[in-house]
Swiss-Prot record:
This is cAMP-dependent protein kinase type I-alpha regulatory subunit. 3',5'-cyclic AMP 1 binds at residues 51-78. It comes from Mesocricetus auratus. The pseudophosphorylation site binds to the substrate-binding region of the catalytic chain, resulting in the inhibition of its activity. Pfam families: cNMP_binding. It is found in: Cell membrane. The inactive holoenzyme is composed of two regulatory chains and two catalytic chains. Activation by cAMP releases the two active catalytic monomers and the regulatory dimer. Interacts with PRKACA and PRKACB. PRKAR1A also interacts with RFC2; the complex may be involved in cell survival. Interacts with AKAP4. Interacts with RARA; the interaction occurs in the presence of cAMP or FSH and regulates RARA transcriptional activity. Interacts with the phosphorylated form of PJA2. Interacts with CBFA2T3. Interacts with PRKX; regulates this cAMP-dependent protein kinase. SUPFAM superfamilies: cAMP-binding domain-like (SSF51206). Belongs to the cAMP-dependent kinase regulatory chain family. Regulatory subunit of the cAMP-dependent protein kinases involved in cAMP signaling in cells. PROSITE patterns: CNMP_BINDING_1, CNMP_BINDING_3. Its main location: membrane.
Length: 167
């Protein structure tokens, strides 16, 4: 439906607790607002169409299979619960690490977020430059790391190291 609204524009004096009446010839601006009601299914379909509109048929099929492949996995990653699975699946890039390979380094800036699909990662930390790294935890499938450095633009706090970590 269409609604009209009026907006009176005037300067106010320093006394905010008093409301003065509009001036005899106020400046009037008219505007209109309209909206259509959509169901959640309509909105999801629209988003899907927008996301897939630039893809050819083969790319659409590949994207659909990628989404199905990751859908169950992504539902187990709590930090992604509120996000659209299609958008998240589209943003994922599989990577593979060798056994013992450093994934991130403590103290370095972080610009990536990792979700473990398969395998485990040892979380290593050292308290000072003179100390050795100590394992303080292990991460496995559906665990994630790197979100704090990425979201807060801070150096990495811990440094996971792969232990047969595969995509």
């Amino acid at each position: 439906s269409l609604r009209e609204c009026e907006l009176y524009v005037q300067k106010t004096d320093s006394r905010e607790d008093e409301i003065s009446p509009p001036p005899p010839n106020p400046v009037v601006k008219r505007g209109a607002i309209s909206a259509e009601v959509y169901t959640e299914e309509d909105a999801a379909s629209y988003v899907r169409n927008v996301l897939f509109s630039h893809l050819d048929d083969n790319e659409r099929i590949l994207m659909g299979s990628t989404l199905r492949m990751y859908e169950e996995f992504l539902s187990k990653v709590s930090i992604l619960e509120s996000l659209d699975k299609l958008t998240v699946a589209d943003a994922l890039e599989p990577v593979q690490f060798e056994d013992g390979q450093k994934i991130v380094v403590q103290g370095e800036p972080g610009d990536e977020f990792f979700i473990i699909l398969e395998g485990t990662a040892a979380v290593l930390q050292r308290r000072s430059e003179n100390e050795e790294f100590v394992e303080v935890g292990r991460l496995g499938p559906s665990d994630y790391f790197g979100e704090i450095a990425l979201l807060m633009n801070r150096p990495r706090v811990l440094g996971p190291c792969s232990d047969i970590l595969k995509r």
